[in-house]
Curated annotation (Swiss-Prot):
Sequence repeat start-end pairs: 180-272, 304-425, 428-557
Name used for this protein in its record: SUMOylated effector protein AmpA
Entry's localization field: Secreted; Host membrane; Host cytoplasm, Host cytosol
Major localization listed first in the record, in broad terms: secreted
Known function: Secreted effector that hijacks host cell SUMOylation during A.phagocytophilum infection and is important for the pathogen's intracellular survival.
UniProt keywords, alphabetically: Host cytoplasm, Host membrane, Membrane, Repeat, Secreted, Transmembrane, Transmembrane helix, Ubl conjugation
Additional information: Pharmacologically inhibiting sumoylation in infected cells significantly reduces the bacterial load.
Amino acid sequence: MYGIDIELSDYRIGSETISSGDDGYYEGCACDKDASTNAYSYDKCRVVRGTWRPSELVLYVGDEHVACRDVASGMHHGNLPGKVYFIEAEAGRAATAEGGVYTTVVEALSLVQEEEGTGMYLINAPEKAVVRFFKIEKSAAEEPQTVDPSVVESATGSGVDTQEEQEIDQEAPAIEEVETEEQEVILEEGTLIDLEQPVAQVPVVAEAELPGVEAAEAIVPSLEENKLQEVVVAPEAQQLESAPEVSAPAQPESTVLGVAEGDLKSEVSVEANADVAQKEVISGQQEQEIAEALEGTEAPVEVKEETEVLLKEDTLIDLEQPVAQVPVVAEAELPGVEAAEAIVPSLEENKLQEVVVAPEAQQLESAPEVSAPAQPESTVLGVTEGDLKSEVSVEADAGMQQEAGISDQETQATEEVEKVEVSVETKTEEPEVILEEGTLIDLEQPVAQVPVVAEAELPGVEAAEAIVPSLEENKLQEVVVAPEAQQLESAPEVSAPVQPESTVLGVTEGDLKSEVSVEADAGMQQEAGISDQETQATEEVEKVEVSVEADAGMQQELVDVPTALPLKDPDDEDVLSY
């Protein structure tokens, strides 16, 4: 099989195939080449038929999509429109030679469709004609992309047009398609993965987990102009390790913390498991209000408690529980725990920039051979904005020595203090309760101290701190609460239970209502003293009640009142009983 490529001065055609045979007859498809791609454009193809003779090439090129046929033996073709070129072969070159025939056009006719047939008209012959023949394999259907330059010459043989013709014949290289690879995601069966989300490592928690001493902090920004920029709560409860040979269980606490803005209602409830689930709610109907004008006052409330926790194996321990000192074999020390901090910024202009709550409960290790249970306390802390209602309730058992010291050693209360009532109620001593293993204890009942071999000391626990900044101009930049409960180590052979205390602290903003109630068991001696050792409370306090109820045998000291609980007069220490 041979292909043909013919270039005339006024027209260019190409043929994929021509017939083989001695007669030299060929037919095929002639197509215009696209100048931009240097490739045949098959939408401009025409049917090409002709005869191939040693002396001349008679070529008929029909119009587009028009078939044509050879009707004459040599010179005459069909009755369809088209052009006929009479092309002479170059002298000295065989017409059958593979590679091409160098020709010149001697005559050209135009075939025109007429009513009776086809009219033939002589037309101007092209100035040159180059006919190329190339061999085609039977399996191939495409023309070669290049032609040997030696076979491309002008009709005169001068070779002037050789390079030009070669450039025309060369086809543009194929355009490579580049496929982008997408990121492969390998999934396990049944798992769903969000490719945009980082996967965080989840720590493994041991079987015995220390119920974190999660100190609750409720912050109420200004109701008018304050903007809460960022609140970060990152409590971490670490593992509880190696608490062998503990004979008496201690009940963990449960904590509920809710904060709403607008009609913000918040309640933090901590209930202890000892047949006693006490919850004291300071409702909005109670007639207690704090004046709207308190400037530059911060009164931290610190309650230092010395606690002792009696453990049983695999039991959970509340590090905030106070326990009376009981002499035991070795000395065990419980590091202090900062319990809670409540901060109420200004109602008008304060801006809360950032609040970070990051309590950390560290590991509790090696508390062997403890024989008596101690009941943890329950705490209720609530803060509301708008109809803000707040409750802070801490309840603990009897037989404890409670000291509620409200002091502002580093703060100054500079404004209005009105109507302070302090009622002290003393309960009668109730009978002594001796515990056995597995028995339930009334948290309000006192238990006699039982001497044992050695002495165990548990350092004080910082219970709560309430800070009320200025209502007008103070700006709270950053508040960080990071209480840490450190390790409890080596508290062996404790034989007598001690009941923790209960404390109620409530702070409200808007219809802010606050009550601080400390209840202890009977048989205790209570002393309620309101003094201003280093503070200045200069003005009005509206409707604040501080109720302190304690049992006989207990000594309670109220050293100072926070800004949320201002005094009537720093020099007036009247105690009102009701």
